Design a protein with these regions (language model features):
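A solvent-exposed interaction/effector surface
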Residues: 2, 12-177
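Sec-dependent signal peptide recognition
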Residues: 1-7
Length: 177
């Protein structure tokens, strides 16, 4: 029993040590934040086995054979029935300095800056929760008279699947600010 408790504690501690994508909160509206996200290097894939492909990339399946530190959040979108997953690369990487993926389905790019409205929720994320919080976010934005640039939800997950308590997930939409 003690070894299971120690395993749980180590997994929980390990999952909290990742570099997290930077953003600036520019406005708070009750449970909603309007944030500015500066450009950041990301790796994305829209092919089957998204997480596995990206995890292999950061585990050394790249031209340099370089192991890349995991970061948070993991970003997921569904545009036109195409699921895309993105990992934020550590801040030391730039357009001139990044590990080139061997998997040609993975694209590494510098994201555009932008303003996004975010709503946070706990527990494990699923389709029903995403729909619920996406609807709530859009409702609150209409009430606040904030213009939505792209209403498609961006789902952010900050925790390892092994973390059971105090999980953090978010739904974002791009807004004009």
């Amino acid at each position: 029993m003690i070894k299971y408790v120690l395993l749980f504690i180590s997994i929980t501690m390990f999952s909290q040590g990742y570099e997290t994508q930077k953003y600036e909160v520019v406005k708070k509206l009750n449970e909603i934040e309007v944030r500015f996200y500066p450009p950041v290097m990301k790796a994305k894939v829209s092919a089957g086995g998204n997480f596995s492909r990206l995890f292999k990339y950061i585990s050394g399946n790249n031209e340099q054979g370089e192991k890349i530190s995991m970061t948070t959040p993991v970003q997921m979108t569904n545009q036109d029935n195409i699921n895309t997953m993105e990992f934020v690369l550590p801040s030391k990487y730039s357009e001139d300095n990044f590990a080139v993926p061997k998997d040609r389905n993975i694209t590494v790019y510098n994201s555009d800056p932008g303003h996004f409205a975010a709503i946070t929720y706990g527990g494990y994320s699923n389709t029903e929760k995403v729909k619920k919080y996406h609807s709530l976010l859009l409702k609150k934005l209409r009430e606040s008279k904030l213009e939505v640039v792209n209403s498609k939800p961006v789902v952010l997950s900050y925790n390892s699947p092994y973390k059971v308590f105090n999980r953090r997930n978010e739904v974002l939409v791009e807004v004009k600010y």
